[in-house]
């Protein structure tokens, strides 16, 4: 510290501090000063006279003020940027400037004066001073602009009065008067009671801390040899920027700012600045003892800047003369930002370099005291208002972003306006209650209940009412499906449609065209009538021809007389040939009756048919002499005798195969399609017969007679020929209706084809054995009939068994009618001869296979 260094006795070159005197620190000096030593030159400030009574204070120099800059500054500068000199020299400015500035917060400031020891051998004392600077409100700006001439007159009067005072007062009194003038604000503030009661707690705390410390100061010119060097006498004084502040482009233009409640003390080239508000920057200047050393005060929108310049004739001006005070309480980041902004603004604006000399007057104290008292009272009211304002909680409502494309998106703008209205302060209480309700976690106390059963019951009742109003209620229940389209019940009138749908659901066998097709896509409610096939057309044509023939026969029978005499004559004529040839009709009846004895009792229905045929053919004389074997129920395409055993065996076989097929369809419909057991119909049987997929054929013996080309008879002959070629057994059994019933069909069936008889082999083999026996009997019957027709019967012929009697009778009966046999009979004879050999071979193979199976079973 400076107190520990050796003291120099030079009264002129150094300033000595008495060690016996303790420094006096004012109560409200909101600054704790700490000096740091360096190699740079240190000049004792003018404020040292305040603390030490024997310190000489140099006379005050001239100050340059810029009131016109303050009045005619930037039009947008805030009202709080007001010069501190207005409060310093109230007599130099109009009265309205101070009156308008009473409602602004005060800024306490310490004044420091630079002095040179060699000019003043004695010491003088001074009091610490504080000042309250109140920047004018917004109204003051207009007043400053209105009266610039009055300000100039006041400045000229101040200059003249100051010059007269300087000439009358000795050199020793000048620094005291200057210092008292510069520190008049602080002195008046100490005298006023309002200042002691101001609510500045931070300044009180700083003042107490400063009063407890007792620093000792000692400065010597020998410690600063740069001041004594002659080369520095003509060099201008340069400034060193403060260590805490930013370095601007012009180091001399450093604004000194502070926040409210945070006093800041800075020492920059003889200027001590303390500010309590960021908006008002107050600078107080104490010029050096040299009359050629001047300080300039320039105003900017951000504050005032004080410059210190040294003229060329000043011999005591040194290079890098700077005195600094290290602050224990540093400024905040906001102060640093304000300083940097102000320095940059000043350096870039050359319009504020104009100078005007303002000389202080001794009348400043009296006028300033009254003004400052008014300022303090107004300040108290202002601070009370400012303190009372934050007690009210202000709700800031953030406006939503405005949508520029309101025309393109009208919905967004409307939604934002609604949200903005909803967030008004009036609804703030409602929003709080809603938030509390949300935080409670209970969204709704009443749970949502859905009764699907009740909904379905209501729907069912409604549909029943609709059906009752429109149509008769159906016996079937209404079916509903949850989550899908409801399936409505069908009426009785749609039974046919249901039957078609059931047929549609049956699978289709791709290998069998007779299988029901799977219907896809749209269907007609009334299906379109199928076109009849060529076979069906032929059958229908013959039916019409037969009907017409019957109509003609009925018409002819009506023309014939129905007298009894004619009947007697016709009966006598019929008896005479019977008496002449007693073996004729009687033997035919015996032959017909004897055939069941050979074939079996099952052929009795066939015998009855044969008996009916001659009766039907009685009107024809020629037909009576020709024995009738075939009839409508036993057609001429049959090559075997009919028997009940064969019919029973065929019925059992077909039922078993149908059962197997249905069981397979229930297990696996796809597999049942590919592995069918049976096929029905003339076309399907012929198709699969040509494909060599059938193993057996069952034909009904009572098919309709159609002798035209391409008719039913030709189709049957084609099927039989194919079966003979492929050595496939074909059986004539049952009639069309019985064959349909054995297949569980409601329609008559003419022919059935068997794909596979697996599982019913025993029944199949038995059927084949019975069929071979019936075919053999049919052959013997035809041979006997030929013999009877070929030779004449003799009366001496011994009685023969029933099998032999019909043969000569038939041969005798057929001899006269050999030339009248139809063509198909000759074809059948050839087929029988060819088939007889194959049938014998088949019988031998069947006997061998049965014997082998018996051996295996044993």
Curated annotation (Swiss-Prot):
One of its GO terms (molecular function) is selenocysteine insertion sequence binding. A motif (Nuclear localization signal) lies at residues 380-387. Disruption phenotype: Embryonic lethality: embryos implant but die before gastrulation. Conditional deletion in hepatocytes significantly reduces the abundance of many, but not all, selenoprotein mRNAs. Conditional deletion in neurons leads striatal neuronal loss leading to coordination defects: defects are caused by reduced cerebral expression of selenoproteins. InterPro entries: Ribosomal_eL30-like_sf, Ribosomal_eL8/eL30/eS12/Gad45, SECISBP2. Residues 678-699 are annotated as: RNA-binding. It is found in: Cytoplasm; Nucleus. GO terms for cellular component: mitochondrion; nucleoplasm; ribonucleoprotein complex. Residues 795-805 have a biased composition (Pro residues). Residues 281-296, 327-352, 430-447, 554-563, 571-582 have a biased composition (Polar residues). Residues 418-429 have a biased composition (Basic residues). Pfam families: Ribosomal_L7Ae. Residues 127-261, 275-296, 327-625, 785-819 are annotated as: Disordered. GO terms for biological process: forebrain neuron development; mRNA stabilization; negative regulation of nuclear-transcribed mRNA catabolic process, nonsense-mediated decay; RNA catabolic process; selenocysteine incorporation; striatum development; translation. The keyword Cell membrane does not apply. Residues 147-166, 188-197, 215-224, 539-548 have a biased composition (Basic and acidic residues). Keywords: Cytoplasm, Nucleus, Protein biosynthesis, RNA-binding. Its main location: cytoplasm. mRNA-binding protein that binds to the SECIS (selenocysteine insertion sequence) element present in the 3'-UTR of mRNAs encoding selenoproteins and facilitates the incorporation of the rare amino acid selenocysteine. Insertion of selenocysteine at UGA codons is mediated by SECISBP2 and EEFSEC: SECISBP2 (1) specifically binds the SECIS sequence once the 80S ribosome encounters an in-frame UGA codon and (2) contacts the RPS27A/eS31 of the 40S ribosome before ribosome stalling. This is Selenocysteine insertion sequence-binding protein 2. It comes from Mus musculus.
């Amino acid at each position: 510290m400076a107190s520990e260094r050796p003291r120099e006795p030079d009264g002129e070159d150094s300033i000595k501090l008495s060690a016996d005197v303790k420094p006096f620190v004012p109560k409200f000096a909101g600054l704790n000063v700490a000096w740091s030593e360096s190699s740079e030159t240190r000049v004792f400030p003018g404020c040292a006279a305040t603390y030490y009574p024997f310190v000489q204070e140099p006379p005050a120099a001239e100050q340059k003020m810029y009131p016109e800059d303050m009045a005619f500054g930037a039009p947008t500068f805030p009202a709080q940027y007001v010069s501190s000199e207005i409060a310093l020299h109230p007599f130099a400015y109009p009265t309205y400037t101070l009156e308008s500035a009473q409602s602004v917060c005060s800024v306490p400031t310490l004044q420091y004066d630079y002095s040179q020891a060699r000019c003043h051998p004695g010491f003088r004392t001074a009091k610490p001073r504080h000042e309250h600077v109140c920047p004018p409100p917004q109204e003051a700006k207009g007043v400053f602009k209105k009266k610039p001439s009055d300000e100039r007159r006041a400045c000229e009067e101040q200059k003249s009065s100051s010059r007269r005072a300087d000439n009358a007062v000795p050199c020793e009194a000048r620094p005291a008067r200057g210092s008292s003038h510069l520190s008049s604000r602080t002195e008046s503030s100490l005298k006023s009671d309002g200042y002691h009661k101001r609510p500045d707690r931070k300044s009180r705390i700083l003042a107490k801390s400063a009063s407890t410390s007792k620093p000792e100061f000692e400065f010597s010119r020998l410690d600063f040899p740069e001041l004594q060097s002659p080369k520095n006498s003509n060099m201008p004084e340069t400034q060193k920027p403060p260590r805490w502040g930013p370095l601007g482009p012009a180091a001399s233009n450093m604004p000194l700012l502070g926040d409210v409640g945070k006093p800041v003390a800075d020492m920059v080239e003889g200027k001590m600045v303390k500010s309590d508000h960021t908006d008002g920057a107050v600078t107080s200047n104490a010029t050096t003892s040299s009359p050629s050393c001047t300080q300039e005060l320039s105003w900017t929108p951000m504050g005032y800047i004080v410059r210190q310049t040294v003229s060329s004739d000043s011999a005591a001006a040194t290079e890098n003369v700077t005195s600094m005070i290290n602050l224990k309480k540093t400024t905040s980041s906001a102060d640093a930002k304000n300083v940097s902004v102000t320095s940059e603004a000043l350096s870039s604006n050359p319009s504020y370099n104009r100078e005007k000399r303002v000389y202080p007057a001794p009348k400043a104290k009296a006028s300033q005291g009254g003004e400052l008292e008014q300022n303090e009272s107004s300040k108290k009211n202002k601070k009370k208002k400012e303190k009372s304002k934050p007690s009210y909680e202000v709700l800031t409502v953030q406006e939503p972003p405005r949508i520029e494309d309101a025309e393109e998106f009208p919905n967004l703008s409307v939604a934002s306006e609604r949200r903005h209205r909803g967030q008004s302060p009036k609804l703030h209480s409602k929003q709080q209650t809603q938030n509390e309700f949300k935080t409670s976690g209970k969204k709704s106390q009443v749970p949502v209940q859905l009764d699907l059963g009740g909904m379905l019951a209501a729907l069912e009742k409604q549909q029943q009412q609709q059906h009752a109003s429109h149509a008769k209620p159906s016996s079937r229940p209404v079916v509903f499906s949850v989550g899908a389209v409801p399936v409505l019940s069908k009426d009785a009138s749609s039974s046919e449609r249901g039957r078609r749908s059931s047929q549609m659901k049956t699978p289709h066998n791709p290998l069998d065209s007779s299988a029901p097709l799977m219907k896809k896509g749209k269907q007609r409610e009334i299906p379109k009538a199928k076109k009849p096939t060529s076979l069906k057309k032929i059958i229908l044509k013959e039916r019409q021809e037969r009907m017409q023939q019957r109509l003609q026969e009925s018409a002819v029978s009506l023309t014939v007389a129905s007298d009894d005499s004619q009947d007697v004559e016709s009966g006598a004529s019929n008896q005479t040939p019977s008496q002449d040839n007693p073996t004729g009709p009687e033997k035919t009846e015996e032959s017909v009756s004897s055939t069941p004895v050979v074939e079996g009792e099952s052929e009795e229905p066939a015998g009855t048919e044969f008996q009916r045929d001659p009766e039907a053919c009685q009107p024809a004389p020629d037909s009576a002499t020709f024995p009738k074997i075939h009839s409508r129920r036993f057609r001429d395409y049959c090559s075997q005798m009919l028997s009940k055993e064969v019919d029973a065996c065929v019925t059992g076989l077909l039922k078993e195969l149908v059962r197997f097929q249905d069981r397979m369809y229930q297990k696996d419909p796809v597999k049942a399609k590919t592995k069918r057991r049976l096929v029905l119909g003339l076309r399907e049987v012929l198709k699969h017969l040509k494909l060599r997929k059938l193993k057996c054929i069952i034909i009904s013996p009572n098919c309709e007679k159609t002798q035209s080309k391409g008719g039913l008879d030709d189709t049957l002959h084609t099927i039989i020929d194919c079966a003979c070629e492929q050595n496939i057994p074909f059986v004539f059994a049952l009639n069309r209706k019985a064959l349909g019933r054995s297949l569980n069909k409601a329609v008559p069936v003419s022919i059935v084809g068997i794909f596979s008889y697996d599982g019913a082999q025993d029944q199949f083999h038995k059927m084949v054995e019975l069929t071979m026996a019936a075919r053999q009997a049919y052959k013997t019957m035809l041979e006997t009939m030929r013999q009877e027709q070929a030779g004449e019967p003799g009366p001496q012929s011994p009685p023969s068994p029933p099998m032999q009697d019909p043969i000569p009778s038939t041969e005798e009966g057929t001899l006269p009618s050999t030339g009248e046999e139809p063509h198909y009979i000759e074809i059948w004879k050839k087929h029988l001869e060819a088939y007889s050999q194959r049938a014998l071979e088949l019988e031998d193979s069947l006997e061998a296979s049965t014997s082998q199976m018996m051996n295996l079973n044993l």
